[in-house]
UniProtKB/Swiss-Prot annotation:
The gene is Pbld2. One of its GO terms (molecular function) is isomerase activity. Its EC number is 5.1.-.-. SUPFAM superfamilies: Diaminopimelate epimerase-like (SSF54506). Gene3D superfamilies: Diaminopimelate Epimerase, Chain A, domain 1. Transmembrane segments: none annotated. Keywords: Isomerase. This is Phenazine biosynthesis-like domain-containing protein 2. One of its GO terms (biological process) is biosynthetic process.
Length: 288
C-alpha cells in the first residue's frame, strides 16, 4: 500500500502554529480498519481521508470528493481544521482548478471555497440550549475547579458542552488556566458529552488585534486532551456569540499553545462561513 499523505497546519498563516491535520488521498477504497490504523500512526488530533467518488474522478479536475475524519481513537462526525487542511492540499498540492470543493461527509455536504486570503468553510449551524449546572457540576469542577462560570450550554447535535467563563476573566486567564482533562471520561461516561469548550468574551478595545471571543477545546473522550484549533466547535460558538454580541461577522482566537485565528460569518440561510489559512508542512508517502 502506497498512499500520498500530507500534514497541513490549519487556521494559521505560519508553519507550526494552528492545528496540524494529516490528509491522505485515496485513489481507491481503503480497508475499513486501515483508516483507524493510519490515524493512530499519525497520532494527530485528526487524520482526514479524501476519496474519489467515481473511478473517473481526478484530484485536479473534480470538485466533489468523499471525506472522513479519524482521531487516534475513533471516527469523528465533523472536523473543521481537517476539512480546511484537505481543501488546502487539493488546492495547493494537486492544483485543483475549481474555486469551490464539495465534500460528502457524515455531516452532509460541506463546501470549501478558495479566497485570496484563505479558505472559507461552509458549515451547518448547531444550536445550543441552556444546561442545568448541577447535572454537570462534577464534570466542570473536575476540569476547572472553582473558576467562575457565567453560562453553560449544551449542543445535542455535536455533544459539546459549552462553558462560558465569567466576563471578569480575559484572554490571558483562559490561556494560563490549568484544565484537568484526565478524569473527565470517567466522570461523564453516558455518551452525552464528547467535548468541552471553554470560552470568554473578547476585549472591547486596545492596541492589539481585536477578537470578539476566545476559546479552548478539550475532547479526552475521543483521545484528544486539547485540540489546538477547532473549526467545528465554531458552528456553535459562532451562533452563541452572535446572539450575545449582536453581530453576524466576528473574529475568533483559540487559545491553545499553538493558537489559531478564525473569521466567522453567520449567513441568512442558517449556515456559517468559517475562514482560515493553511500551511502544508509535510508531504510524503505512506508505504505500510
Amino acid at each position: 500500500m502506497k498512499l500520498p499523505i500530507f500534514i497541513a497546519d490549519a487556521f494559521t498563516a505560519t508553519a507550526f502554529r494552528g492545528n496540524p491535520a494529516a490528509v491522505c488521498l485515496l485513489e481507491r477504497t481503503l480497508d475499513e480498519d486501515a483508516h483507524q490504523d493510519i490515524a493512530r500512526e499519525m497520532n494527530l488530533s485528526e487524520t482526514a481521508f479524501v476519496r474519489k467518488l467515481q473511478p473517473t474522478d481526478d484530484f485536479t479536475q473534480s470538485s466533489r470528493f468523499g471525506l472522513r475524519w479519524f482521531t487516534p481513537e475513533a471516527e469523528f462526525p465533523l472536523c473543521g481544521h481537517a476539512t480546511l487542511a484537505s481543501a488546502a492540499v487539493l488546492f495547493q498540492k494537486r492544483k485543483n482548478t475549481n474555486s469551490t470543493l464539495t465534500f460528502v461527509t457524515m455531516s452532509g455536504e460541506l463546501k470549501a471555497r478558495r479566497e485570496e486570503d484563505g479558505i472559507v468553510l461552509d458549515f451547518p449551524v448547531y444550536p445550543t440550549f441552556p444546561q442545568d449546572f448541577h447535572e454537570v457540576e462534577d464534570l466542570i469542577k473536575a476540569a476547572i475547579g472553582d473558576t467562575l462560570v457565567q453560562d453553560i450550554r449544551y449542543s445535542p447535535d455535536t455533544k459539546n458542552l459549552l462553558v462560558r467563563l465569567s466576563d471578569s476573566y480575559d484572554r490571558s486567564f483562559l490561556e494560563s488556566l490549568k484544565v484537568n482533562t484526565e478524569p473527565l471520561p470517567a466522570i461523564e461516561k453516558t455518551g452525552k458529552v464528547r467535548g468541552l469548550i471553554l470560552t470568554v468574551k473578547g476585549e472591547p478595545g486596545g492596541q492589539t488585534a481585536l477578537y470578539d471571543f476566545y476559546s479552548r477545546c478539550f475532547a479526552p473522550w475521543v483521545g484528544v486532551a486539547e485540540d489546538p484549533v477547532t473549526g467545528s466547535t465554531h458552528t456553535l460558538l459562532g451562533p452563541y456569540w452572535s446572539e450575545e454580541l449582536g453581530k453576524k461577522e466576528m473574529r475568533a482566537f483559540q487559545c491553545s499553545r499553538r493558537g489559531g485565528e478564525l473569521d466567522i460569518n453567520l449567513r441568512p440561510d442558517g449556515r456559517v462561513d468559517i475562514k482560515g489559512g493553511a500551511v502544508i508542512v509535510l508531504e510524503g508517502t505512506l508505504t505500510a
